[in-house]
């Protein structure tokens, strides 16, 4: 009986990055659909072949994709199916229903699909990224982008089964077995506990950006956020803004012209750099608004922002612009504010609305945000079960 699904990728399981949050949520969702699961990701260090190779994280069985079983050494999963084959043999090939590969490099995805077809396992590609040019390394970018184009345009059709993070990407996969799963979380877990309800008392509004802005800030538009708060400070408005995921020095290395603005905001703006996932959630849990802004390009439209999912699950209002499927979940003026776009003027206007919101209206907004549990597993069980029932070998 084929009763097990393997989820494979470069999931940062120790740091609990966005990919790990996604993997653990999908594994819990698949288990809710009646399957057993195994996650092949990355621990902080590659386990020794004779060490304890298996860990349980949030109730899900996990192994390191670089050393999935004793023996080896194994070739890299980025170009070989050997680590997947070893894990499948450990479980029993005739028990593995599917292998889901998360944002795999093209060579690794091709090897995975070929292996699955040879042994009667259903190949799935979990695609949440369609990157564009990043940084200044020409050869690296050309090689990387060629692989990404091959994965998104050709290998998705070769696999025949694709998990999409957005309807924007799903619409580009005609004839393929697809499901849109932005995120699925077990919101009964302690990390998704919400803070006590706001009493509506007049106080300084607290804004948080928490995420990985990308190489050269290519993913998230940090510059308009800093410029917007500088404008609002000149207007005499009081606020607190915390930036998680990039330090002050790292930011100014990328945008040195903002040094005067950052200095002007020193009493209202705090850069925390990288923190643990648990610490990040604690800060988000106790803020008034989560903010982030992205260009409406294929990078933003293919994926779905983890920071949106986390804030929405914690019942925190969100200020952002419409990319991907965000417009389906964020109702302007109800559970947050939608900026008209990601430029400085548009970002300033949206944040200003958050600052001008009366205390009673803010309480109502928080209440509206908390009425929705948009990314709980129970919301996604039916479409996931339907997708798994249609899997193609």
Question: What are these language model-derived features?
Answer:
Residues 1-52, 161, 227-234:
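N-terminal subdomain of nucleotide-sugar transferases
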Residues 17-18, 216-223, 278-283, 290-309, ...:
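Nucleotide-sugar-dependent
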Residues 22-28, 187-188, 192, 199-258, ...:
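Conserved catalytic-core segment of nucleotide-activated headgroup transferases in glycan assembly
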Residues 25-28, 88, 107-109, 114-118, ...:
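Membrane-proximal helix-turn-helix segments that form the acceptor-binding/catalytic region
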Residues 41, 132, 149-194, 198-202, ...:
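Donor nucleotide-sugar binding/catalytic pocket of nucleotide-sugar-dependent glycosyltransferases
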Residues 46-47, 80-83, 99-120, 125-127, ...:
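An aromatic- and histidine-rich active-site surface loop
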Residues 332-333, 337-344, 353-359:
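Conserved acidic donor-binding segment of nucleotide-sugar-dependent glycosyltransferases
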Residues 342, 359-391:
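A charged, aromatic-enriched C-terminal amphipathic alpha-helix characteristic of glycosyltransferases
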């Amino acid at each position: 009986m084929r009763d097990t699904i393997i989820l494979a990728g470069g999931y940062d399981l120790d740091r609990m990055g966005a990919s790990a949050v996604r993997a653990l949520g999908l594994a819990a969702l698949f288990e809710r659909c009646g399957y057993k699961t195994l996650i092949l990701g990355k621990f902080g260090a590659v386990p020794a072949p004779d060490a304890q190779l298996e860990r349980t994280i949030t109730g899900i069985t996990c192994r390191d994709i670089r050393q999935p079983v004793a023996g080896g050494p194994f070739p890299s999963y980025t170009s070989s199916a050997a680590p997947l084959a070893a894990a499948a043999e450990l479980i029993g090939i005739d028990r593995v229903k599917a292998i889901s590969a998360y944002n795999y490099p093209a060579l690794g995805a091709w090897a995975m699909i070929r292996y699955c077809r040879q042994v009667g396992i259903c190949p799935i590609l979990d695609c949440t990224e369609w990157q564009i040019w990043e940084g200044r390394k020409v050869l690296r970018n050309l090689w990387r982008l060629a692989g990404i184009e091959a994965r998104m345009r050709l290998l998705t059709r070769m696999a025949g089964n694709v998990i999409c993070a957005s309807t924007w990407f799903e619409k580009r996969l005609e004839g393929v077995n697809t499901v849109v799963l932005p995120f699925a979380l077990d919101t009964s877990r302690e990390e998704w506990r919400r803070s006590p309800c706001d009493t509506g008392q007049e106080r300084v509004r607290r804004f948080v950006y928490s995420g990985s802005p990308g190489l050269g800030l290519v993913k998230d538009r940090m510059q308009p956020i800093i410029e917007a708060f500088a404008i609002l400070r000149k207007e005499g408005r009081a606020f607190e803004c915390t930036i998680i995921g990039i330090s002050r020095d790292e930011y100014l290395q990328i945008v040195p012209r903002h040094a005067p603005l950052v200095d002007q905001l020193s009493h209202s703006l705090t850069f925390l750099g990288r923190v643990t996932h648990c610490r990040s959630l604690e800060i988000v849990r106790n803020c008034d608004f989560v903010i982030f802004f992205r260009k409406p390009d294929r990078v933003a439209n293919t994926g779905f922002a983890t920071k949106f999912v986390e804030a929405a699950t914690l019942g925190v209002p969100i200020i952002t612009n419409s990319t991907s499927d965000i417009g389906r979940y964020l109702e302007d003026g109800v559970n947050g504010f939608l900026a008209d776009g990601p430029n400085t003027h548009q970002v300033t206007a949206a944040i200003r609305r958050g600052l001008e919101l009366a205390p009673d209206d803010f309480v109502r907004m928080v209440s509206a945000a908390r009425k929705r549990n948009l990314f709980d597993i129970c919301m996604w069980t039916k479409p996931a079960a339907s997708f798994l029932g249609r899997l193609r070998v």
